[in-house]
């Protein structure tokens, strides 16, 4: 991936706020997982039910460790860290200290390790996992253009990368403890 001035500017804004960016699945809104103010901004922007929680994206399991219950078996940690051919979100036991902003009312936390170059760049340059959610208002279709982003969010986003390089399919979701696929 070529790191251009737009990506560097997105990184700058990601450190303190909410950006719109392509992911390995859909066009999304993102912020640092360790920034409660930005997480609350996403909840407010999307008019999102706070009981739902978010997906955490990371380029490596090390970025997810502060959020996952450390009592999970080493076998499950190995499975979580293993690369997958298809974008796969795992539901994992959450840390006892986890902010309710991240998992909502859920007993499990949604996490995805991705080799997406943009997410990798963001994680490695911030030292943090990212919150990920679709770029839409709750119950509406995902934005696929800057015009739709403006309709949904006005000028509330800190920065927007163009939605020109994403896959339009959501990830599959698997409960890591039971192996049951829910999407």
For every predicted segment, state its role:
Residues 1-183:
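Active-site-adjacent structural elements in enzyme catalytic cores
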């Amino acid at each position: 991936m070529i790191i251009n001035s737009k990506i560097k500017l997105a990184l700058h804004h990601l450190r303190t706020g909410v950006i719109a960016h392509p992911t390995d699945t859909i066009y999304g809104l993102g912020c640092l997982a360790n920034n409660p103010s930005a997480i609350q901004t996403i909840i407010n922007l999307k008019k999102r039910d706070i009981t739902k929680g978010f997906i955490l994206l990371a380029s490596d399991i090390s970025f997810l460790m502060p959020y996952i219950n450390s009592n999970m078996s080493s076998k499950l940690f190995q499975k979580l860290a293993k690369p997958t051919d298809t974008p796969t979100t795992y539901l994992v036991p959450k840390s006892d200290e986890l902010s309710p902003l991240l998992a909502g009312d859920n007993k499990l936390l949604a996490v995805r390790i991705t080799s997406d170059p943009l997410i990798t760049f963001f994680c490695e340059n911030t030292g943090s996992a990212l919150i990920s959610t679709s770029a839409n208002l709750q119950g509406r279709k995902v934005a696929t253009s800057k015009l739709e982003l403006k309709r949904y969010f006005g000028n509330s986003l800190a920065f927007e990368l163009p939605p020109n390089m994403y896959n339009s399919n959501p990830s599959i979701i698997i409960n890591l403890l039971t192996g049951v696929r829910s999407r």
